[in-house]
């Protein structure tokens, strides 16, 4: 039985009243800004362009500047920046000149977490979905958590919310090692994979050691929740000197799933926990990777005393996260329609998991993928993996690499990827010129019953809504909210 969790008043940050975010529209920044607005702070922020995110923050009282200029930061008591912000940014330069503190976003998140019962979700893949599932289950258990998520939680219509309880659930970002700022009570490690390796000087051992260091930020009475199915997590487990709970499909796991059945968008499975009755669970997401995300959630909810009824309710009622296998609707084609799906996956492991989920849930349907690689460096470092995984589509269209501020790297572009995939002999990918309209290219390739997946972390994210509105797909049916 969960005890009533009274909200703990957030102590004020000394003389800080006005907080300025450089790049406030970013997915990692806007959520923290929204929570701070709800706590009563004055919030301002700048970004290169206005967006629905900045408009939402403006409606809550934030002052938004389009473009980066020195005067934007002139009245701030502190600047919050992400790792994407150049140190030469005029607002940052002005703050440093005026001795205004400049802090990374993770340090501000850590400040919000300092006086709360923090639950931090780390791992190369699955952070956003696991964090979102936790928010849903905690809410179903009556705990009303504060949450900061790297994606839009469909049920809440936002990626952040100030709750009334002492719980704060957030993603822990390893991409720039900033998760070391966090000192949670509970930490999850979903998996550890080679990504963002420039942060770790190309040394995978350094990445592993940093995850261990993150887990040792837990107090001695905290809890590390670790996926035993991931070989790297299993490898570092003996080094973790904190209480641990393991989860996975492995028979050795403390909390494990058996009897997994996938039916389209729904996945059903049985959960086995030590010294407890089996639990029958359903989630509205396809794929074994989402079963693992649900198991991490169940492990924490069980430890926090949330009832089985609330766990089942929170998982079955979960409505998903924006761009995580988000079904937009049906596009009309000759003889029927095509299911249009949008997904954020931008690492070969994530692409493979989604392809496997599609094959499991819709085994008789063709999979047409429009994919945009994210960063030249990632494309270079994981090139062979991309070639192998993307070659498993039935039809593949490749957009040019989304640079994310990087300069092109010879041999790490989408034309070269097309060439390498073609050489495997399984399919003939189509290269999409930068700026080309997608609808006329993709429509002739589609057949009734296909699944059309738009995938990647760049501007490919705008394609699904564009296709829904395209005159070439007049009569497209929008997916109804659950």
UniProtKB/Swiss-Prot annotation:
Gene3D superfamilies per record: Mur ligase, C-terminal domain, Mur-like, catalytic domain, NAD(P)-binding Rossmann-like Domain
Keywords recorded for this protein, A-Z: ATP-binding, Cell cycle, Cell division, Cell shape, Cell wall biogenesis/degradation, Cytoplasm, Ligase, Nucleotide-binding, Peptidoglycan synthesis
Give the gene that encodes this protein: murC
Instruction: Name the Gene Ontology molecular function terms of this record.
Output: ATP binding; UDP-N-acetylmuramate-L-alanine ligase activity
Write out the catalysed reaction: UDP-N-acetyl-alpha-D-muramate + L-alanine + ATP = UDP-N-acetyl-alpha-D-muramoyl-L-alanine + ADP + phosphate + H(+)
Q: Which leading EC class covers this enzyme?
A: ligase
Q: What does this protein do?
A: Cell wall formation.
Protein name, UniProt field? UDP-N-acetylmuramate--L-alanine ligase
Instruction: Give the UniProt subcellular location, in the record's own words.
Output: Cytoplasm
Q: Which domain of life is it from?
A: Bacteria
Which GO BP terms sit in this record? cell division; cell wall organization; peptidoglycan biosynthetic process; regulation of cell shape
Binding residue positions for ATP? 123-129
Q: Does the record bear Transferase in its keywords?
A: no
